[in-house]
Amino acid sequence: MAAEKTMEKIVALAKNRGFVYPGSDIYGGLANAWDYGPLGVELKNNVKKAWWLKFIQESPYNVGVDCAILMNPQVWVASGHVGGFSDPLIDCKDCKTRHRADKLIEDWNNENNIEFRVDGLKNEELMQYIKDKGVRCPSCGSANFTDIRKFNLMFKTFQGVTEDSKSEIYLRPETAQGIFVNFKNVQRTTRRKIPFGIGQIGKSFRNEITPGNFTFRTREFEQMELEFFCEPGKDLEWFKYWKDFCYNWLLSLNMKKENLKLRDHEKEELSHYSNATTDIEFLFPFGWGELWGIADRTDFDLKQHMTHSKDDLSYFDPTTNEKYVPYCIEPSLGADRVTLAFLCEAYDEEEVAEGDVRTVLRFHPALAPVKIAVLPLSKKLGEDADKVYQMLAKSYYCEYDETGSIGKRYRRQDEIGTPYCITFDFDSLEDKSVTIRDRDTMQQVRIKIEDLAAYFENKFEF
């Protein structure tokens, strides 16, 4: 019987093996702030590289940008964030704990096995539901709540030497707006024709009321977003194209179908400007959570920026001889969230013999933080084994380990997800060959050192 996969086990491994540390740890930390350690930064970078490879580099349609975090405040007025980017905040009067009202209801429903979606409900409807169902504070058990009020999620700061309303700016709550305001620049300089997309990876900031579940929801996070511009009327076929593309990208990196589901938003959930929205959800140990939002945003964003900036962001289509404001399909993915999902997907405990259980992270080789570990059987072989390490390290992120028994070293590498271990033994001095052990099957093959480059050439592609 397989051991239960829990967040407690995954978080413990992440902290102990250098994937993720509590932020500001020696000062007692900061609520829900996390630092990526040596293995975590490699894993997350590999996730970002995999996204960039398929969505930008190999795509015939898309190009990339890297926009500033700090933008003219009018950008956020135009986008609607200043006026409407808020969460419903509710306080428990007895213990003074603050909650996000919709999440309070969702958690209550999950605990009581109630199937009911709160997306799209107004504050008055949320409040009425809390009263009707007798929803209680998870901190103290009280049902004595304040009224719901709006809480703007943007971090505000000041630019320059004065702290007044004229110098107010915001940390961006999403990367998308940097793409929209650069639509004309990118189209002009790249001479792209519709349909085409602009993607970027970057940090965003949201002053979440109830962050939690490790790195799933944090106030500082990284996004991988694509804005794909197309002709009006063809948006729904492109929406389906990108929805399928995103889903297949996850499958190609070893996510199991049974741990993924596509949830189409009901009409009452949709934003007023949206033709369609689908969430790709992943089954975390704590339950289903949104990974990817794919939205047909129509021409809303470009038109908003046209109105507020007075700049013309329309496009003249040389094929149809028409001028129009393009529609936009937005697949928006959280880099931290999907990295956590890959970590949860990869975690496994396998009984290799009676009473002998190994912990192994079954990452797709393209995502594995360490690709190859070089393990000399004896420290006396270190000088020759190091030459193998140096040769491979030019192409792959490798680890060299000569401490402990070979069995313990294999287990250490299994636990951090290293796909291949190379053992350099005393025979290697004579036959110029090494033993390669596969992480998942634990099977071993003997390979000439001079053939290693060819052996690994296609092992890390997807």
Curated annotation (Swiss-Prot):
GO terms for cellular component: cytoplasm. Substrate binds at residues 100, 174, 221-225, 330-334. ATP binds at residues 206-208, 216-221, 290-291, 334-337. It catalyses: tRNA(Gly) + glycine + ATP = glycyl-tRNA(Gly) + AMP + diphosphate. Signal peptide: none annotated. SUPFAM superfamilies: Class II aaRS ABD-related, Class II aaRS and biotin synthetases. The keyword Aminoacyl-tRNA synthetase applies. It is found in: Cytoplasm. One of its GO terms (biological process) is glycyl-tRNA aminoacylation. It comes from the Bacteria. InterPro entries: aa-tRNA-synt_IIb (IPR002314), aa-tRNA-synth_II (IPR006195), aa-tRNA-synth_II/BPL/LPL (IPR045864), Anticodon-bd (IPR004154), Anticodon-bd_dom_sf (IPR036621), Gly-tRNA_synthase/POLG2 (IPR027031), Gly_tRNA_ligase_bac (IPR022961), GlyRS-like_core (IPR033731). Its EC number is 6.1.1.14. The keyword Nucleotide-binding applies. Keywords: Aminoacyl-tRNA synthetase, ATP-binding, Cytoplasm, Ligase, Nucleotide-binding, Protein biosynthesis. GO terms for molecular function: ATP binding; catalytic activity, acting on a protein; glycine-tRNA ligase activity; protein dimerization activity; transferase activity. Pfam families: HGTP_anticodon (PF03129), tRNA-synt_2b (PF00587). Belongs to the class-II aminoacyl-tRNA synthetase family. NCBIfam families: glyS_dimeric, PRK04173.1. Homodimer. Catalyzes the attachment of glycine to tRNA(Gly). HAMAP family: Gly_tRNA_synth_B. This is Glycine--tRNA ligase. The gene is glyQS.
